[in-house]
Amino acid sequence: MVIIMPTTYELKIYGKVQHVGFRDRIENIGKGLGINGIIYNYKDGTVRILANFDDEEDKELFKKYIERLEKKDKLIEIEKIEEKRLNTYIEFPEGISRLSSDDILELNKKLDEGVKYIKLIFAELEEHKKVLLEIKDMHVKTVEILSEHTRILNEIKDTLKDIKDKL
């Protein structure tokens, strides 16, 4: 009986992938696909994954799921994924586990990122408020114009009635 050992790969994901919930999504994908490995933020802004794959098809499927995250989550932007086959096999616990070098630092960065997005949301809301106020003003003017037209039409109607009565 031949036992085929999984192959360990390092995947480097470039783009806006740190402090946007990316690693959590990868953990879920890995769990769903039965892939074992670790995931961590690297100091150059990439996210790195060390994972075992039984075959090339599993690895490509995993990468496709990663690439699709960008369509599902507007905070995630993936520029590219690089892969490197490692010359050694690393045995990982079941699933994909997150490594954090400094949980407090990570939390602070995520809070800062969250505040940035909240500010962007408020700026968008202000723009929407301006547009809604403009629409409201146009509505008020339209109602005034329609009221004036209704008054004029009623005058014309009364005048036509008077003419009809005289004939």
From Swiss-Prot:
Gene3D superfamilies: 3.30.70.100. One of its GO terms (molecular function) is acylphosphatase activity. This is Acylphosphatase-like protein MJ0809. Residues 8-106 form the Acylphosphatase-like domain. It comes from Methanocaldococcus jannaschii (strain ATCC 43067 / DSM 2661 / JAL-1 / JCM 10045 / NBRC 100440) (Methanococcus jannaschii). InterPro entries: Acylphosphatase, Acylphosphatase-like_dom, Acylphosphatase-like_dom_sf, Acylphosphatase_CS. The lineage of its organism: Archaea, Methanobacteriati, Methanobacteriota, Methanomada group, Methanococci. Signal peptide: none annotated. PROSITE patterns: ACYLPHOSPHATASE_1 (PS00150), ACYLPHOSPHATASE_3 (PS51160).
